[in-house]
């Protein structure tokens, strides 16, 4: 198994024909050998961030890319069920991808309140506790 860095995915999605073809061939060779690429959750977080903020992709398109990665046998995605649930929330405009991921993890732990200055977690179904406001 090899660790996959975000930059490779960004190059693959860049639309630059030469980069896309080279990486596609590399992925195909790995797949034929039965090798896997480890994709830590941080890679998915970075990928979503750069596609949204750097490349100005729409959330629906980002959702499709992440789902493709999650469903491809070549990629061993860390915390796959959490990522899958978070990207669904994100695609429905429930918050930033990182907030969606945090909320999925918190809900799995039975957490119902978030200590935060913002109100953005209310959209995700949490009670917000602001340390500067009275309890």
UniProtKB/Swiss-Prot annotation:
User: Which co-factors does it depend on?
Assistant: Mg(2+)
Report domain PINc positions: 3-130
EC number(s) stated in the UniProt entry for this protein: 3.1.-.-
User: What's this protein's name?
Assistant: VapC ribonuclease aq_1901
Q: Describe the function of this protein.
A: Toxic component of a type II toxin-antitoxin (TA) system. An RNase.
Provide the residue positions that the database annotates as binding Mg(2+).
Answer: 5
Enumerate the Gene3D superfamilies for this protein: 5'-nuclease
Gene Ontology molecular function: any one: metal ion binding
Annotated InterPro entries: PIN-like_dom_sf, PIN_dom
Species this chain originates from: Aquifex aeolicus (strain VF5)
Q: Which family does it belong to?
A: Belongs to the PINc/VapC protein family.
Q: What keywords are annotated for this sequence in UniProt?
A: Hydrolase, Magnesium, Metal-binding, Nuclease, Toxin-antitoxin system
């Amino acid at each position: 198994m090899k660790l996959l860095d975000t930059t490779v995915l960004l190059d693959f999605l860049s639309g630059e024909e030469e980069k896309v073809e080279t990486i596609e061939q590399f992925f195909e060779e790995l797949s034929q050998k039965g090798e896997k690429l480890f994709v830590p959750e941080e890679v998915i977080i970075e990928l979503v961030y750069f596609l949204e903020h750097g490349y100005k992709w729409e959330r629906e398109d980002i959702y499709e890319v992440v789902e493709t990665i999650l469903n491809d046998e070549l990629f061993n995605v860390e915390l796959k069920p959490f990522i899958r649930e978070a990207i669904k929330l994100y695609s429905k405009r429930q918050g930033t991808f990182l907030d969606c991921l945090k909320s999925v993890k918190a809900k799995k732990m039975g957490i119902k309140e978030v200590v935060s200055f913002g109100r953005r977690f209310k959209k995700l179904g949490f009670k917000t506790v602001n340390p500067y406001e009275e309890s």
